[in-house]
Structures are given as C-alpha cells and as structure tokens.
Amino acid sequence: MSMNSYGHLFRVTTWGESHGPALGATVDGCPPGIDVDAAAIQHWLDRRKPGQNKYTTQRREADEVEILSGVYEGQSTGTPIQLMIRNTDQRSKDYGDIAEKFRPGHADITYWQKYGIRDPRGGGRSSARETAARVAAGGVARLALAALVPAVKITGYMVQMGPHGIDRECFDLAQVDENPFWVPDAKAADEWAAYLDGLRKSGDSVGAVIEVRASGLPAGLGAPIYGKLDTDLAAAMMSINAVKGVEIGDGMAAAALTGSANADEIHMGDNGPEYSSNHAGGILGGISTGQDVIVRFAVKPTSSILTPRATITKAGTPAEIITKGRHDPCVGIRAVPVGEAMMACVVLDHILLQRGQIGGKVGETRGKIG
C-alpha cells in the first residue's frame, strides 16, 4: 500500500504533484442525494489558495475545482466523486539546482532513500500543494454534514505564530475572517503582521499553532481503543505537511494539572448532561461528549528559505544550497483551512460509522440520561 488514502466509510484518496498537470481527490463513500456543486467547494478552496496576500507564497493558482464523476444534476450519486484541480503557474526552472541536492528540512532525502527516484519540481508529492486536494474533499464533507447534521460548525484559526500567542481574554471568533492570519485576536493580528514583515525581509520563516473547533457534534461519535475519534483526528492532522505535533483539548498542558483541576465535572441541564469545563477537548474514552471538539496542531517553520545551508548531493559530496522559488514565510496561515477540511472529513466519517453500527437517526444516542 502506498498510503495515499484516509478514512473508513468516507474515504479520500489524493493524487498529483506540485508541478504536474493537475492534482485532485477521489472521494468514496459520500451518501447519495447530497447537494454538491463546484461553487460550494470552491468557496473553501479560495480560502487556501496561494497568492492572496503578501504573507503567503506568490505562486498564482486559481485552484478551480472540476467535478468529473459521482454527481448528477447537482446531487451525489453514491459513487466515487472525482475532483480535479489543474496546476497553471508552475516554475519548474526554479528547482533545477535541487535535482542533485537535498534540501535540509524537506522530504527530498527520505523520498530518495525510500523510492530511489523523486520529482524535485516543487517537492513533487511531498509539497503542501497536495493539501488543495484535501480542502476540496473537505468541501464535499462539509456539504454532507450540512445535510445530515446541520448544527455542526467547524472553525479553524491560528493561536500562535513563532513565540507570539494570542490573548485568550481577547478571543473573538468574529475576528477570524477579518485578518490575513485567521487569528481570533485583533491586537495579535497587528503584532504578527509586523513580526512576519521582518522575517520576510530577512528571507527567513516561522512556525505556528492552529486550533480547529467542531461545535454542534452529537455525543457518541467514536469507538473504544483502536477506533477512537481522537485517534483519527490526531492521525488526520499529523498527516498535514509540516505538522510536528497534535493536541486534543488541553493536550500537553494537562500533564501539569491535578486530577481535581482537570476533571470536567458533570451536572444535569435542561437538555441533558452539561460539563463545567472542557479540558478533555470534547472527547472521553475516544467518544465525543457533545461538547466542542478541540484539536491543535503545530507546524514547523517553512524549510524553503533564502539562508544558505549545508547539505549533500546524491553522490554524497558536501554542498551548499539556497532555496529559490516562491514559498510561504509561515505555512501555518494556509494550514488553517486544511485543518478544517481534515476535521470535516473525520467527523463525517464517524457520523457514518455511528449510523452504520448503532442505527437510528444521526446524532441519536442509545444510552438515555434523565
């Protein structure tokens, strides 16, 4: 297996390279009768596409999605949905110098060691360009969620850029779409702009932390031990290019808490169980509680920088490399809609799994309380 697919019942396979003629996704398992149109998917792709401001790569790609199969008269047929995005602004000549050299921090050397062949143009299959296909697939998942569980809302945002985090006291989701960093803190957005301007001018890059929140989920999604909702969410986020760490709820910070501080106490509300806090990130024992599911992931600094670095060639000789081409000074910015897409795909997958195993209406729990 070459591991280009993810999901159980809602299964996505992505294909294509950064500088190939096209890339895309095959979405298998979308329920029939879902309203699916290219314009709706395009909305999500437009949030990820490059060249929208000075803080992202200046590669100009329209990222226009084409639906090749699985949709008839605007509705899903239950057969595989093939999505394609044509590449139109490749500059393969920018990568001539790295055909024989390995870029530090990139997958060049590991792809070569594994396969004995690699596409050096823009990183080939290992390029973050692959995430456009994920966002397209996530668009299909969002449309299915809107039809099956309209209450579900998925929102991603940046909570840290380099050493600079947001002020949680100023947290305001209404600010997310008002700045180029998808940050829910207006003051932080201004500070980050000045910080990233300095890094851009020096030819350097920086990492980030992205948080993705799914609200309106029913309790009961996920399964014990090996089918945990958080297991699949962690794997989905970890599969995104440049991601080096994933947390659910308080994550690593929970290790510093006492049991009494970490406990999300339960009481009975008018509409069922309610919790005093959400340290667990909406998941207990691998199963959703009905609270917001909260996931964070950290992306490393973009490895494509203008600073000269030591490396070796395929022949093993010492070399120096400066990465040319057009690159993101902070890949975390465009990782926000990618994280949202992965959340949508995993959540829909588990809703379909729950329906298949337990039966009944979507979101209906078997164990009644009160």
From Swiss-Prot:
Q: Which GO terms describe its biological process?
A: amino acid biosynthetic process; aromatic amino acid family biosynthetic process; chorismate biosynthetic process
Instruction: Give me the residues that bind FMN, please.
Output: 125-127, 241-242, 285, 300-304, 326
A GO cellular component annotation in the UniProt record: cytosol
Names of the cofactor(s): FMNH2
Note the superkingdom of the native organism. Answer: Bacteria
Q: What class of enzyme is it?
A: lyase
InterPro entries hit by this protein: Chorismate_synth (IPR000453), Chorismate_synth_AroC_sf (IPR035904), Chorismate_synthase_CS (IPR020541)
Q: How does it assemble?
A: Homotetramer.
Q: Which family does it belong to?
A: Belongs to the chorismate synthase family.
Q: Spell out the protein name for this chain.
A: Chorismate synthase
This chain's source organism reads: Jannaschia sp. (strain CCS1)
The encoding gene: aroC
